Amino acid sequence: MGQAPKRLPLSGSEPKFTQKMWGRAVGINNNNCYAYAVGDYEKKRSYKSVPGERAGIKNMNHSYLSCMKLPQRVIADNPKRVYMAKAEEKCKPGHYKVMMFIAPGKPTNYFRQGDFHFYKQVNEVEYKVKKGNTHESIAGFFKVPLTRVKKAMPKLVAGKIMRFKANIFSHKRGWATGPLVTDAKGKVIVDPRKASRDYPGLNYKKYCSSFCVKNKGIKVGHTHSKVGKKA
């Protein structure tokens, strides 16, 4: 067997992975990866949230071909509630880890446009048992001890929700999906930097930064009042 992947440190303030709200039609269609990563759920958004918008940055145009000034824009959206950190660093109490990547895009005859993507660290996982699941298959998929899975639900029942701690990362692919814990190859995400991020048309191959985000009160996008501080 291969070596178990190294988990990144927890602060104890990580959100739970759940499909509630975020995985329903309203949650899927109005909350992109940025909003999901920072926990800013909204029932109605006219367009997707982008870093720096809430900060009121004058020139919002960004090609996302590089990470230039993107981390600063994220911080400017929620000053004093978000700070940059190393990926291996433990966040302060009341904060959790978020990572940002970009897909530089592919050159065309006319333009080149990239994209950004965010992942957030979660600890407790709500998992809906599927037909054919075994304790061994669930433990193997999430890369957690078998005893932990058996304790969470001694007798597996398809369709029921089980809860256990996994210390993994979750993300949401724009307005196209609900919350996910799998990468582009369908594997559970223990560390986004080591996960597959190559999707058809978008390869989020460039790691920009890690942040520690306060676990409540974060707002992004056009649906909230401006911070009033330019970055």
Task: Please state what every model-predicted region is.
Residues 33, 67, 113-115, 134-137, ...:
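Short, charged amphipathic recognition helices of the HTH superfamily
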Residues 131-133, 148-164:
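Short acidic, glycine/serine/threonine-rich helix-capping segments at coil-helix boundaries
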Residues 158-231:
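Active-site or metal-binding loop neighborhoods of secreted/extracellular toxin and effector enzymes
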Residues 2-4, 64, 114, 219-230:
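Extended terminal accessory/targeting regions
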